[in-house]
């Protein structure tokens, strides 16, 4: 609400819950707001699409302690709460790398960073910061299962082939209380 007030005071028109259905030259757009169509033209136009986390499903993915990176950031940055003590991160893109580093700064132990891709997906500067803390990277690996009865107590990962199929005999287990992706 404070941000909306600041924008209003700066003369910015904010339109929420709207869909841009046309973009034209000279900074003009057509926007659907509810059942109405509106046309806007301005010196500057900012379109903020919002975001939704991609959920990867695997046995145990609905256990408490399996959380998205955005949820982990909200817990740390907004509520001042550690998402867990021992955390396995799935994803080596910029989000996974940055959130892993934030978790470490928050006092969490990131036991591993896992990605099915054969190469780190994020910027080298972010990967280097995480690597310097001693977090092992498991590339060409993915989650097999999250274990636990009423919350996550462990995660098993395995190496994957070029078709992203598990390679038998490559499983590794980690005792964790949180699995983040």
Could you describe each region identified by the protein language model?
Residues 64, 73-119:
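Rossmann-like NAD(P)H-binding beta-loop-alpha module
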Residues 1-86, 163-177:
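FAD-binding core/adjacent interface of flavoenzyme oxidoreductases
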Residues 63-66, 93-96, 124, 131-134:
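Short, surface-exposed, charged/polar-biased interaction segments
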Residues 44, 85, 92, 100, ...:
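Generic serine detector
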């Amino acid at each position: 609400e404070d941000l909306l007030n600041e924008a209003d005071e700066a003369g910015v028109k904010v339109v929420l819950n709207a869909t841009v259905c046309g973009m034209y030259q000279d900074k003009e757009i057509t926007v659907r707001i509810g059942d109405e169509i509106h046309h806007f033209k301005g010196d500057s136009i900012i379109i903020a699409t919002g975001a939704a986390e991609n959920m990867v499903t695997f046995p145990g993915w609905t256990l408490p302690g399996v959380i998205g990176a955005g949820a982990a950031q909200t817990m740390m940055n907004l509520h001042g709460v550690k998402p867990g003590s021992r955390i396995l991160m799935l994803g080596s893109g910029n989000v996974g790398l940055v959130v892993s580093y934030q978790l470490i700064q928050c006092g969490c132990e990131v036991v591993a960073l896992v990605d099915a891709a054969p190469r780190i997906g994020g910027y080298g500067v972010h990967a280097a910061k995480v690597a310097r803390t001693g977090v092992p990277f498991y590339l060409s690996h993915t989650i097999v299962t999250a274990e636990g009865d009423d919350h996550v107590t462990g995660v098993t990962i395995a190496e994957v082939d070029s078709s992203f199929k598990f390679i038998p005999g490559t499983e590794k287990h980690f005792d964790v209380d949180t699995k983040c992706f």
